[in-house]
Amino acid sequence: METLKKYYTVLENRTGIWLENDEIAYLSDKSGIIQVWKMNIHEKKPVQLTYYNERIWRLEAAANHRDILFSTDLGGNEQEQIFLLKAGETEPVNLTDDGATRFNLGGTNAASDMVYFTCNRRSKPNFDICKMDIGTREITTVLENSDNMNMPSSVSPDGRFMLYNKLKGMSDNRMHIVDMYTGESRDIFPEGSFAQYGSPAWKSDSDGFYFTCDENDEFLYVGYYDVATGTVRHVYHTDHDVTKVALSCDDKYLAMVVSVDGFGQFRIMDLTKGSFISCPVPPNGFIYTYAGMHWSPAGHKLLFTFSSGSRPTGLWVLDLDADAVYALTDSELSADIRDRLADPEARSFTSFDGLRISYLLYKANDNPDNPTIIQVHGGPESQEFPMYDPLIQYLVGQGFNIAAPNIRGSIGYGKSFHHLDDVEKRLDSIQDIACLARHLLETGIVKPGRLGIMGASYGGYAALSAIAHYPELWSAAIDIVGMSNLETFLENTAPYRRSHREGEYGSLANHRDVLRKVSPIHVAHRITAPLMVIHGANDPRVPVSEAEQIVTNLESRGISVKYLCYGDEGHGIMKLANKLDCYPQVVTFLKAHLL
């Protein structure tokens, strides 16, 4: 499995932020786990700044562009703590130091002597708006909340306002603005209803901000909020999601990312003219929207994270002044696997009710005997993106095809599509997977007996459901941190997550019958395919009891189950040593049952 190791030791560099003097800080797994690094963009000599055994979750620059704020947890438990690394110092300071509380980092005030965040210190299911005096470590509660999970999204340049989202659901996260001096909070679109908001980009004078939302629309569009008047105006709309915006520091250029079947496209608007400009473009692939996108403090360099099937995740720069786009970081990709990497082809099929479903196909070659694996993304309010995945790339190199669908319930195809799997409609998305399987068989991409399925989180739930409801289609399945019983999942997930997850799956108070009906544990007697189950013991999202239930059920009936549980992991396998233990076993399992 030495070759597989080369795929997993390719560097992931992402989430870049600008510091002073053309320096950036960013996240990289060069040490084997995601840590904070920095480098000068001209010298390109990376320097490691943190040395923890746990991954870094969030990274922000202080308002002074010298100090760095970040968060990490313990063993994947997601009880994030906020750390400060001051310029010129080598030892970060744990500002919060309360392992019983989760702190969601917001940012700093203009003087960089106060840090803003939300936390559930007062009440574990709820997140209050708070600020801390960095000098004294005194925490002040600005606004108490009793409505579950409130996530900070941005702080105004003058430090007066913080924006935060109220997560009623992953796609129902109304944005609020809170005055950090007075505690006054208001919904930026009070007459609105069910919608998602994100990616705020403040003007330098703090008078307002650009953002994305799908209020009263099928797709995410760009709006502008005026703080003084409390009004919203439309800026840009298209028949695809605008997933990210970023405003240059001189307020001249507004960068937007438009997602078409998961492939990112830049649109740059010159706000002084109200029109788009031409600009160099990166290769065809995925522009990470959740990993940040930032303009340089001086000039017009846009720092972003990019990946494709054949290009591992790295930091790139779009330099408008130089009319150039280029990779900034090195993935250290081994020369002997560089030419093996495959980019996917965007395809589609028609599901049981006539709905068009898109999928990405990574094809090994034209050999009709190649096994094929359907990989289902998590979320479910997420999307399959054309990005580097070490397991996919290795399997393709070993002669496997990978089909990665965006079944109903995925984002990126409109709000109506997004909600076609809610609550009692859950199994319609599983029927989409069965239709894809039959499509692959009918088109000759795979032969009977050579089809498998795998997925993580919701994708793990989907894999379990597919092999239970359509057992005749599958010869192997892999469930990674997936739910086997939606009822017990909601009962045992972290208290602050329950409410916004109930918006997707149904509530314990009103939908227990539905939750039982759509849970694979209750139809597990139909499962015949060999199964591999992988989980982290500290998972706060999908408790390890979800894995234990399905493993115990199948083993009691003599069904082949291989179970891996990692004591120092949470919701996913993040540490290199564990990856190098886990994924060779995944490959061995798939080869044994599909080749």
Residue ranges and their predicted role:
Residues 32-37, 77-83, 124-130, 171-176, ...:
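Structural motif
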Residues 294-295, 301-321, 484:
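Structured, non-catalytic alpha/beta "coupling" segments that mediate domain-domain communication
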Residues 18-19, 61-62, 108, 155, ...:
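Residue-level recognition of a conserved intra-blade site in WD40 beta-propeller repeats
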Residues 15-65:
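N-terminal cofactor/phosphate-binding cores enriched in small/glycine residues
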Residues 1-14, 39-57, 75, 85-102, ...:
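Multi-bladed beta-propeller domains
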Residues 20-31, 40, 49, 69-76, ...:
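Beta-strand C-termini and the immediately following turn/loop, strongest in propeller blades
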